[in-house]
């Protein structure tokens, strides 16, 4: 449990405007429950849930809803996960067909208990989706495959996604505090290796800001990402899911986010989404088209 010394007052630009009707939100939730599928939107208490669900979109979370790690910023449950559902790829593909989605994002919990970190399940989902929805573009947001990277990449390369995303999350100085069990350089290596195997595919990574990092440290991480051939970047404001999670150290202004976007584009990123509510999967379809998201 994280002890909070002082809670910062949330600025006006972080006030969320809720949709006038929650009908579509209820429909999405009912669809997920009926298919026994999970969304990271719900499990992580994403601030954009109402907007995305109201627009008929969601980020699917495969391999269960229990993570093998316990990161103090994350709201996803942790513990001993269940055996992967072998029917999940087919259920996922069917749901995507029924929802009429043309761009989907698939993520997962960490599965350090599996020999491949869950890579084969990702591939099974990609293949099932493409079999039913050949025109649907697929973005994956993967864990770091700790201890299984070589095996995981070999498996993913048999059916690569259209966009490969792995979030670096924050700066190396804070990793032990923010991402226990993760390694900054391992995450960079994963992104670089996938790009080496698939040079024509976009690689993407994102960071949360407001956890105690400095602007200079964020800039340095951006440089590291470019040096490892990452082409797309997302920067967003960290928001505390509950009083049991890491507190916000600072709220970044919209102007600062705009400045960071200019910095990133000057470094050579082909696309950058930088803003208070930006998450790596937030309007991912628009991000992939190069349309501004913030």
Curated annotation (Swiss-Prot):
HAMAP family named in the record: Lipoyl_synth
EC nos: 2.8.1.8
Catalytic activity entry: [[Fe-S] cluster scaffold protein carrying a second [4Fe-4S](2+) cluster] + N(6)-octanoyl-L-lysyl-[protein] + 2 oxidized [2Fe-2S]-[ferredoxin] + 2 S-adenosyl-L-methionine + 4 H(+) = [[Fe-S] cluster scaffold protein] + N(6)-[(R)-dihydrolipoyl]-L-lysyl-[protein] + 4 Fe(3+) + 2 hydrogen sulfide + 2 5'-deoxyadenosine + 2 L-methionine + 2 reduced [2Fe-2S]-[ferredoxin]
Compartmental location: Cytoplasm
Annotated keywords: 4Fe-4S, Cytoplasm, Iron, Iron-sulfur, Metal-binding, S-adenosyl-L-methionine, Transferase
Details of cofactor binding: Binds 2 [4Fe-4S] clusters per subunit. One cluster is coordinated with 3 cysteines and an exchangeable S-adenosyl-L-methionine.
GO MF terms held by the record: 4 iron, 4 sulfur cluster binding; lipoate synthase activity; metal ion binding
Family: Belongs to the radical SAM superfamily. Lipoyl synthase family.
Binding site for [4Fe-4S] cluster 1: 41, 46, 52, 281
Any single Gene Ontology cellular-component annotation: cytoplasm
Organism: Baumannia cicadellinicola subsp. Homalodisca coagulata
CDD domains: Radical_SAM
Protein name: Lipoyl synthase
Cofactor(s) essential for the protein: [4Fe-4S] cluster
Residues involved in [4Fe-4S] cluster 2 binding: 67, 71, 74
All residue ranges annotated as the Radical SAM core domain in the record: 53-270
């Amino acid at each position: 449990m994280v002890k909070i010394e002082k809670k910062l007052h949330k600025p006006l630009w972080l006030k969320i405007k809720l949709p006038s009707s929650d009908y579509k939100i209820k429909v999405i939730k009912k669809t997920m429950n009926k298919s026994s599928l999970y969304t990271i939107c719900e499990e992580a208490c994403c601030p954009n849930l109402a907007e995305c669900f109201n627009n008929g979109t969601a980020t699917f979370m495969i391999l269960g809803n229990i993570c093998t790690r316990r990161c103090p910023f994350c709201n996803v449950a942790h513990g001993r996960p269940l055996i992967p559902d072998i029917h999940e790829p087919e259920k996922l593909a069917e749901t995507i067909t029924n929802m009429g989605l043309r761009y989907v994002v698939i993520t997962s919990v960490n599965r350090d208990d599996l020999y491949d970190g869950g890579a084969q399940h990702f591939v099974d989902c990609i293949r099932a989706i493409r079999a039913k929805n050949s025109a649907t573009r697929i973005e994956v947001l993967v864990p770091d495959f700790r201890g299984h990277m070589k095996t995981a990449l070999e498996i993913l390369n048999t059916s690569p996604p259209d966009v490969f995303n792995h979030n670096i999350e924050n700066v190396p100085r804070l990793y032990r505090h923010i991402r226990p069990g993760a390694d900054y350089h391992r995450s960079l290596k994963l992104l670089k290796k996938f790009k080496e195997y698939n040079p024509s595919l976009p690689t993407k990574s994102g960071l949360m800001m407001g956890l105690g990092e400095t602007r200079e440290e964020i800039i340095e991480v951006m440089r590291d990402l470019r040096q490892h051939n990452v082409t797309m970047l997302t920067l967003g404001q960290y928001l505390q899911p509950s009083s049991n999670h890491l507190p916000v150290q600072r709220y970044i202004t919209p102007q600062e986010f705009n400045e960071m976007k200019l910095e990133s584009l000057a470094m050579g990123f082909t696309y950058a989404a930088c803003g208070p509510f930006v998450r790596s999967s937030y309007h991912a379809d628009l991000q992939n088209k190069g349309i501004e998201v913030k």
